[in-house]
Structures are given as C-alpha cells and as structure tokens.
C-alpha cells in the first residue's frame, strides 16, 4: 500500500475535495516534503499535462503516480458515460481513453467517478446501468494494455443515483463478466453518507477494492 495526496489542475473544481491547486511542480514538491509516496492528478484533460514533465517531476521528488482522475470530463466538459446521446457517450469514452493513455505508461490507473452520470429523463435506471457497465468493461480492457486496472468509484446520492454503496459497486462489477480489469474505489466521504457501517461496507467490497480515499 502507498500513501498519496491529490493535485487538481481544474479551475472549475477549485474549492472541491482536493489538497493542492497550484500546479504539478508545487504539488509534487509539497507532497514529497510531507512524506507521501505518490500523487493523484486531476487534469482538465490528458492534453493539459505534459507527460514528460510529469515523469521528470515524479523522478525528481521520488514519487509515484497513483491515479489520474477523469472528473473534469463532467465538471468541465459535461460528458458522461450514460448520456442518452450515443455520440456524447462515445466522446466520454474517448476522453477516458486519453486519460488512460496518460496514466498507464506511468503505472497509474484512471478513476471513473462523476463521469458515470445518472439516470433520468429518457434513460431509466436499467438502461443507464447497462451503458455504464458496457463502458467500464470496454475501458477496463483498454487499460489492460498498460497492465493497470480501471478504477470505479461509487458516489453519494447527491452526485449520482446509480451506484451509491460498496454493495452497489460489487453488483455492477460482478455483472461485467470474468476478470473485467475494473476495481472499486472506497471513498470514505461518500461511504459516510451512504453506508450504515463502514467496516461492513469495506468487507462487502472485499477483493473488488483497489483504491481508497480518506
């Protein structure tokens, strides 16, 4: 297990649940000074990050890259994997694939959180979960070329109405077939809202949990 801390590069998310906001160089320097093993980076998009510069900063500060978030896909670009518009869903998938291609060569995974979207309007719950499952399966397979899993994060009820608990996440992943290359992110903020017992929820997540947010 390695400890990590977050660096957000997304101005539209300023004030959100991230620690460092003043660029990669500042974030990596401060993460190393605090003794963390790794950083999580949340960029506006893959093109906003110079992979060579990021690798050099990680090497300079003896850090690893734990994950790269895709949240700006929704926050900045209004893309989800469950949109009623098939072209929007494809654009969402393409955005995530670019993040995977940024993170994967550095040994890191992409995180799917807010880009999972919600059901409503012309898309009922079953259809939305079908879209989400298809996307996770395809993107997990895409990530396999980099020998990293895709990370999927259940969110609280105020951010999605699809998967809000560890049990929901397990059910979704179990429906993806054998060895889908997708793991769960157990985020204690969301879990504190949705779970009746954190310990039981973590046990329910079990082998599916591959990443934790405190």
Could you say what each language-model-derived stretch is?
Residues 1-104, 137, 179, 207:
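N-terminal pre-domain/capping segments
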Residues 9-11, 43-45, 71-72, 116-118, ...:
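Active-site-proximal loop/turn and secondary-structure-junction residues that shape catalytic pockets
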Residues 14-16, 193-196:
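A short, acidic/glycine-rich surface segment
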Residues 22, 60, 79-183, 193-195:
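Active-site acidic/histidine proton-transfer and metal-coordination neighborhood
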Residues 28, 184-186:
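Short, compositionally biased strand/turn segments
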Residues 40, 67-69, 111-112, 151, ...:
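Conserved beta-strand positions in the central sheet of alpha/beta enzyme cores
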Residues 50, 163, 197-200:
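Alpha-helical transmembrane segments and their juxtamembrane interfaces
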Residues 55, 195-214:
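A short alpha/beta connector and helix-capping loop motif
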């Amino acid at each position: 297990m390695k400890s990590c801390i977050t660096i957000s590069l997304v101005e539209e998310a300023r004030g959100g649940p991230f620690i460092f906001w003043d660029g990669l160089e500042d974030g990596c320097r401060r993460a190393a000074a605090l003794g963390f093993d790794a950083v999580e980076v949340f960029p506006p998009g893959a093109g906003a990050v110079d992979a060579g510069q990021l690798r050099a900063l990680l090497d300079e500060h003896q850090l690893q890259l734990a994950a790269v978030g895709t949240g700006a896909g929704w926050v900045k670009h209004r893309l989800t994997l469950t949109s009623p518009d098939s072209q929007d869903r494809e654009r969402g998938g393409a955005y995530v694939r670019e993040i995977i291609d940024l993170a994967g060569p550095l040994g890191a995974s992409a995180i799917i959180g807010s880009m999972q979207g919600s059901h409503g309007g012309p898309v009922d719950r079953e259809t939305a979960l079908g879209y989400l499952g298809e996307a996770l399966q395809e993107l997990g397979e895409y990530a396999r070329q980099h020998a990293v899993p895709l990370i999927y994060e259940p969110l609280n009820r105020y951010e999605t109405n699809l998967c809000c608990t560890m049990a929901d996440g397990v059910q979704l992943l179990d429906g993806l077939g054998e060895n889908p290359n997708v793991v769960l992110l157990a985020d204690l903020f969301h879990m504190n809202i949705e779970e009746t017992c954190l310990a039981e929820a973590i046990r329910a997540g079990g082998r599916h949990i591959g990443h934790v947010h405190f």
